[in-house]
């Protein structure tokens, strides 16, 4: 799990509860037990591709089941997926966000892994209301991301083939 995420959650007063991992993703029985037992669960946090520290990738079947559990227990999913562009072998597994029918999945990706580690810039896909709240929170905390790196990233995406760069 990304330590930056855990520190952010703790700073905001969250009580983080771990769920054991299996080679194909979260232990779904343990996840459902936690969803049933815990009060006021706000979201499921999951790194679906090359989970840290195990390196496991959540299977598509388990992604569907995680989404179904989130619907059943009416919780959001934070899919932290900074590595999904970096698969060089094996079968591509679409992000959990691709299953999202009701604005329940917040997808976070990273440009640091695919453009330059020093850039430390990411992107998000979520429902409009959540993106607007996130933007307001970001502006209140540090005004904005480095404009120069935003412009460099935008220009790169406009001019070059990202898939060829990663391959």
PLM feature segments, named:
Residues 13-23:
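Short beta-strand->loop structural element characteristic of the AMP-binding/adenylate-forming
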Residues 1-14:
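Substrate-binding/gating loop at the entrance of the active-site cleft, primarily
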Residues 12, 72-73, 103:
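Helix C-cap/helix->beta junction micro-motif
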Residues 101-167:
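Conserved core segment of the aminotransferase class I/II
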Residues 24-87:
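Active-site phosphate-binding strand-loop segment of PLP-dependent enzymes
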């Amino acid at each position: 799990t990304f330590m930056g995420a855990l520190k952010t959650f703790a700073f905001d007063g969250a009580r983080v509860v771990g769920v054991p991992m299996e080679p194909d993703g979260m232990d779904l029985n343990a996840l459902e037990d936690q969803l049933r037992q815990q009060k006021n669960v706000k979201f499921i946090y999951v790194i679906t591709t090359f989970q840290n520290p195990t390196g496991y990738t959540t299977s598509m079947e388990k992604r569907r089941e995680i989404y179904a559990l989130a619907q059943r227990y009416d919780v959001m999913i934070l899919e932290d997926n900074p590595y999904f562009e970096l698969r060089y072998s094996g079968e591509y597994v679409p992000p959990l966000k691709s299953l999202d029918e009701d604005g329940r999945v917040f997808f976070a990706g990273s440009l640091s892994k695919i453009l330059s580690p020093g850039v430390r810039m990411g992107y998000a896909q979520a429902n409009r209301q959540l993106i607007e709240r996130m933007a307001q929170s970001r502006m209140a905390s540090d005004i904005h991301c480095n404009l120069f790196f935003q412009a460099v990233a935008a220009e790169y995406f406009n001019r070059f083939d990202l898939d060829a760069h990663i391959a």
